[in-house]
């Protein structure tokens, strides 16, 4: 099974080698019949501390790195 890749925005880089990424998804609400935006935050491993707040990045699923981290930063979405 391939590993999931998500795109999001860095909202926090205060932790060492960790960034918090906000991933937004859109779906059609079954009752209201309108598009709804929903976001979720993921902690991702950033080995070199190169990503800053506001950066658009891709994160990939990985084995557990710590209690909360199960994602690693793959690349910058601009590159």
UniProtKB/Swiss-Prot annotation:
Top-level lineage group: Bacteria
Alphabetical UniProt keywords: Ribonucleoprotein, Ribosomal protein, RNA-binding, rRNA-binding
GO-annotated molecular function: rRNA binding; structural constituent of ribosome
GO biological process, one term: translation
Keyword ATP-binding belongs to the record: no
GO cellular component, one term: cytosolic small ribosomal subunit
Secretion signal span: none
SUPFAM superfamilies: Nucleic acid-binding proteins (SSF50249)
Subunit structure: Part of the 30S ribosomal subunit.
Job description of the protein: One of the primary rRNA binding proteins, it binds specifically to the 5'-end of 16S ribosomal RNA.
Family per similarity comment: Belongs to the universal ribosomal protein uS17 family.
Designated name of the protein: Small ribosomal subunit protein uS17
Organism: Bartonella henselae (strain ATCC 49882 / DSM 28221 / CCUG 30454 / Houston 1) (Rochalimaea henselae)
Taxonomic lineage: Bacteria, Pseudomonadati, Pseudomonadota, Alphaproteobacteria, Hyphomicrobiales
